[in-house]
Amino acid sequence: MDRAAGLSQTLAAEAARLARRQSDREEELELVRRAQRYEPDALGRIYEIYFPKIYQYSYLQLSDPQLAEDIASGVLLQVVESIDKFHYRGTPFGAWVFRIARNRIIDLHRRKKRRQHVELNESIPTDYGAPHQETERVLEHERVRGALDYLTDDQRQVVLLKFAEGLDNQAIASVIGRSEGAVKSLQHRALVALRKSLSDSG
């Protein structure tokens, strides 16, 4: 394959990827518009999509299944109560949801610090239904979870949002309140630190 043909294929693949992304975003916005009209099936769909994601995001930071479930439930309740306040300005709806989750986790850490009490529960529940089965498989990787503890908070947020939840740099920047350039730098430093930690523990 000559260079021109290779470039053409690359550009075509990128165009297709962007088209799929635009289509996904339009579908999500339509779902949000329906949820803002409080259509039950739309609200239910948002719950189905985001509860497992927020549960995993929370558990990887809290190591406590009950706290993670409480956070996920509280976030989804807040999303329903304030969904009419969401206005699309280029940032995906998912970034708005994860920002709520991040703020709740930060508040929880602050309350724990004030009480000088940190409760960690390393067990994984076995009685969850299907929505949590994939999460449980992911969380079996104890070395990875332990390595996350060696990252700064912003580095950990970038890794979780990028690789566990699939958000792009623009969305991550919105969630953590940093620039896209800062997100790229945090991602690079986090991956270097993770490789070192996993290598040392291996």
PLM-predicted stretches and their roles:
Residues 2-13, 137-138, 174-177, 191-202:
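C-terminal edge and immediately downstream basic/flexible tail or linker adjoining helix-turn-helix-like DNA-binding
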Residues 11-17, 24-25, 115-137, 141:
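Internal acidic/polar
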Residues 12-16, 47-65, 82, 98, ...:
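Amphipathic, Lys/Arg- and hydrophobic-enriched alpha-helical face
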Residues 26, 32-55:
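A short, charge-rich alpha-helical start-of-domain segment used by transcription regulators
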Residues 36-37, 60-65, 74-91, 111-113:
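Sigma70-family region 2
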Residues 70-77, 91-103:
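Structural recognition of an alpha-helix C-terminal capping motif at a helix-to-coil junction
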Residues 81-88, 98-120, 137:
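Arg/Lys-rich amphipathic alpha helix in sigma70-family domain 2
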Residues 146-157, 161, 165-182:
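Helix-turn-helix DNA-binding module
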